[in-house]
Swiss-Prot record:
Signal peptide: none annotated. HAMAP family: HTH_type_SgrR. This is HTH-type transcriptional regulator SgrR. InterPro entries: SBP_5, SBP_5_dom, SgrR_HTH_N, Tscrpt_reg_SgrR, WH_DNA-bd_sf. Residues 163-493 are annotated as: Solute-binding. GO terms for molecular function: DNA binding; peptide transmembrane transporter activity. It comes from Salmonella typhimurium (strain LT2 / SGSC1412 / ATCC 700720). Keywords: Activator, DNA-binding, Repressor, Transcription, Transcription regulation. Activates the small RNA gene sgrS under glucose-phosphate stress conditions as well as yfdZ. Represses its own transcription under both stress and non-stress conditions. Might act as a sensor of the intracellular accumulation of phosphoglucose by binding these molecules in its C-terminal solute-binding domain. One of its GO terms (biological process) is negative regulation of DNA-templated transcription. Residues 26-49 bind DNA.
Length: 552
């Protein structure tokens, strides 16, 4: 019998007997474990051989045998839990232990660095699974970061300074205002072993032509080997940066025929997905990566939903150590939580409603009514970026007849729930009921259901001149809620003629967008890690981080 199954049987037997020595029979024990008398004898002999118990059998009618436990079920359960942790079988660990608080402590104690069979392993604790990693679809902040570790694109944007770097394309040039040429590296391989071909690149870029920022691409062809021409309908100074974004990452041309591609994608990036379950995401360094091979061999993201109840935890790489020493990387996000008024509903479009609601739900009001741990993480927002002060909150009078408002946000985000509760209480003081809708992220991103106001958080990446407009423009919800000439704005942005500060100020002037709070992004640990630099998404580039090897 496998060791794990035998351990489970012993724990069950120990629990049924309360761990006490007793006189019993094979039949009675077999009934307890729902097995045959013969199988029960085999179990007892095997457990005795392991030193877990003694079984003093008595032969004869009416005779009772003595069962003595030498090992406690709790001790064996702990040993079994340790084995499951080492094997990264978190789902079985949760079933074994049952108590989520105990599971959490076990996970935290095993976070951080592990050195096994010459391989460096990093374990991270996170609060939700990441089922969808498919570029070009609605991806949240963390999925966006993970996708960048799995896939490559023609270009790459440096996370630290926003500068453009070579990736699949080693050089590029603008042939004319409407034609860009990219020169691709040969010999690149996908994680499943096949060599990258030009058709993979062309099909990947063609599939995203329906997205607003890529809709001006009219033709993609290859005039010579490993040369790619991209034809545009209007000039775009940002095209090389655009082709370094997650939607433009390169997929195998027949990706739709590959099983579970969204959760187990195949790219050409520094890490390949090995496992993606509700309890764990495991990615391994790709030995045939065309760039510098990652120094951390394996990254395990352990999922424990209950930690979402503690918004201050941030990204946890290592548990507490003796003496209370803390190793924390933090930064104020380039972005904010904000309210979005929906012009498609009468209440959402009403200027007086916008003015009054933004007054009642002002950043200072939210901060004042938040719990102390959150007050330390929140900073009042008066613009989309921390350095901007575009919002001009007025006194505002409550519109006559306003009795209810509908607020919508997406699931699995504890701070959205906290903010919504505070908003509900503040509005209730004015006899306004806040109806709250919590929906899937895909639904939220599409913005096709009815809501007066929407709650969102935006994290802008470097360079901000690129990402601020690109991020807002690529979310269908915003285009649905804010009636304006988005195509005209995009043309102006592509031409480099947009004053982004003025453009954002326009959105805030009519209260289409109301900034609420800036949030401190936090990474707890890792004391022994080198090269860890937090990016604007609250994560760090796995392939650039490393551990000093253990002492010989």
């Amino acid at each position: 019998m496998p060791s794990g199954r035998l351990q489970q049987q012993f724990i069950r037997l120990w629990q049924c007997c309360d761990g006490k020595t007793q006189d019993t029979t094979l039949n009675e024990l077999a009934d307890l474990l729902n097995c045959s008398r013969r199988h029960m004898r085999t179990l007892l002999n095997t457990m005795q051989a392991r030193g877990w118990l003694t079984w003093e059998a008595e032969v004869g009618r009416g005779k009772r045998s003595r069962l003595t436990f030498l090992y406690t079920g709790l001790a064996l359960q702990q040993q079994r839990a340790e084995d499951l942790l080492e094997q990264d079988r978190i789902d079985q660990l949760v079933q074994l232990v049952g108590d989520k608080s105990a599971v959490r402590q076990m996970l935290i104690s095993h976070l951080g660095r592990s050195f096994r069979q010459g391989r460096h392993i990093l374990r991270v604790l996170y609060y939700r699974p990441m089922h969808n990693l498919l570029p070009g679809t609605a991806l949240r902040r963390s999925e966006t970061h993970i996708a960048r570790q799995i896939f490559s694109s023609l270009t790459r944007v440096n996370e630290e300074n926003g500068e453009l770097e070579a990736d699949i394309a080693h050089h590029w040039q603008q042939i004319s205002p409407l034609l860009w040429r990219f020169y691709l590296r040969p010999g690149i391989h996908f994680h499943h072993g096949r060599e990258l071909e030009m058709e993979d690149v062309i099909s990947s870029l063609t599939r995203i032509n329906t997205l607003p920022l890529y809709s001006h691409i009219t033709k993609i062809d290859s005039p010579t080997a490993w040369t790619l021409d991209i034809h545009l309908s209007q000039p775009d100074r940002w095209l090389p940066w655009l082709l370094g974004q997650v939607p433009a990452m390169i997929l195998p041309r027949k990706w739709e025929t590959l099983a579970n591609f969204a959760s187990h994608p195949i790219g050409t990036g520094p890490y390949a997905v090995r496992r993606n379950t509700p309890n764990q995401l495991k990615i391994l360094a790709f030995d045939d990566y065309f760039g510098y091979r990652a120094l951390i061999d394996e990254v395990n993201v352990w999922v424990l939903p209950d930690i979402s109840e503690e918004p201050a935890c941030g990204l946890m790489l290592e548990g507490p150590i003796q003496g209370g020493e803390k190793a924390i990387e933090s930064r104020l996000e380039e972005g904010c939580y904000y309210l979005l008024f929906d012009a498609r509903t009468p209440r959402g479009a009403h200027p007086q409603v916008r003015e009054w609601v933004s007054h009642v739900l002002s950043p200072t009001n939210l901060l004042y009514h938040a719990d102390e741990p959150l007050q330390q993480l929140w900073f009042p927002a008066y613009g989309l970026l921390p350095r901007w002060h575009h919002a001009r909150p007025g006194p505002g009078e409550k519109p006559a007849g306003l009795e209810t408002l509908t607020l919508t946000f997406y699931r699995e985000h504890i701070e959205h729930r906290v903010i919504a509760r505070i908003m509900s209480a503040l509005l209730a003081e004015h006899q306004v009921h806040l109806h709250i809708q919590e929906i899937d992220y895909d639904q939220w991103h599409a913005g096709e259901i009815e809501s007066d106001i929407w709650l969102n958080s935006a994290n802008f990446t470097l360079p901000l001149d690129f990402s601020l407009f690109a991020h807002l423009c690529e979310v269908p919800l915003l285009q649905n809620c804010i009636p304006r000439d988005w195509q005209g704005d995009a043309a102006q942005w592509r031409a480099g003629e947009m004053n982004l500060a003025n453009w954002c100020q326009q959105l805030l002037a009519n209260k289409a967008i109301v900034p609420l709070i800036h949030h401190w992004l936090i990474i707890q640990g890792q004391r022994s890690m080198r090269g860890l630099r937090m990016n604007t998404l609250g994560w760090f580039d796995f392939k650039s981080a490393w551990f000093a090897p253990p002492d010989p």
